[in-house]
């Protein structure tokens, strides 16, 4: 379905520079777009691509349009303060227009306990299991093999992709998106040591601590494929509104993730950690348990966080990749730091003795 720039602006705002009747039916990158496609400029370093793009129209910020000057002549633009966000909203619209409607109803192979409550407008796919006391609200879509445990609520308009498991006693807010293979509400990693003795004489075992809390997820949360969120030991693990979690993320029991925080793939967050609002956690970050990150904290990829970071800012502890030979030389220096320290101390002592400086 093609829409004019005028129609897009009526729906999403912005101002038109060029032909308001220019039609676009899809989106593409600046360097690949053709007539009938909408591109966007989010990074000024690609400004030169706007001059050569074949796109029918370009989403652009006012300051970047000014930089184009005469090169903008004859081209079509939607001018908006945030072209990237505008692009995302238009992309969502095109996806919705192209998606075939799913008819409400329950697939014959689904298993639904009589004590569960499923809205008439819900879409329940093949081999879905819904246990007693579960509530499936209006417009929910549960794809094949989804499991919803007893007493769990899935909020209105949510979409759970195939093979998602939501254990008992959890709550997922409205408009959530949970991708394939995610597990919500599995037991937290809680074991009490019951050992006697030391070393080889040590005897005893680990005693499992029942995890009697749940998981509470706010509205507009998205959870990536194969991500796991553990239930709380006593109180709930909490994911606040509009949190976005990538694939293969582990969130331990009793954590609280603040609203509008984003967490990239393979991050691991140990139990009882609190992350503030509007934080950004990079890929493969590891965060120790029982620490607190304040609002607006950014932790870069592969960093390890072992203590609280209460102040907003950017934090890094990862070592960036370097040439292998350079790495070996650096590693050799690190191994010899103790010797170098001792040599420097000896030199300082000798120099102080020559000066008669007994305080050194």
UniProtKB/Swiss-Prot annotation:
Enzyme Commission number(s): 2.3.1.191
Q: What GO terms fall under cellular component here?
A: membrane
- Which BP terms does GO give this entry? lipid A biosynthetic process
* Catalytic EC class: transferase
Query: What CDD domains does UniProt report for this protein, alphabetically?
Result: LbH_LpxD
One Pfam family it belongs to: LpxD
Q: Does the keyword Magnesium apply?
A: no
Q: Which InterPro entries match?
A: Hexapep, Hexapep_transf_CS, LpxD, Trimer_LpxA-like_sf, UDP_GlcNAc_AcTrfase_non-rep
Name the pathway. Bacterial outer membrane biogenesis; LPS lipid A biosynthesis
Identify the catalytic residues.
253 (proton acceptor)
Q: Which reaction does it catalyse?
A: a UDP-3-O-[(3R)-3-hydroxyacyl]-alpha-D-glucosamine + a (3R)-hydroxyacyl-[ACP] = a UDP-2-N,3-O-bis[(3R)-3-hydroxyacyl]-alpha-D-glucosamine + holo-[ACP] + H(+)
Among the GO molecular function terms of this UniProt record, one is:
N-acyltransferase activity
Sorted keywords for this record are: Acyltransferase, Lipid A biosynthesis, Lipid biosynthesis, Lipid metabolism, Repeat, Transferase
HAMAP family xref list: LpxD
Q: State whether it acts alone or in a complex, and with which partners, per the record.
A: Homotrimer.
UniProt record similarity statement? Belongs to the transferase hexapeptide repeat family. LpxD subfamily.
What this chain does, per the entry, is described as: Catalyzes the N-acylation of UDP-3-O-acylglucosamine using 3-hydroxyacyl-ACP as the acyl donor. Is involved in the biosynthesis of lipid A, a phosphorylated glycolipid that anchors the lipopolysaccharide to the outer membrane of the cell.
Please state what the protein is called. Answer: UDP-3-O-acylglucosamine N-acyltransferase
Q: What would be the name of the gene that encodes this protein?
A: lpxD
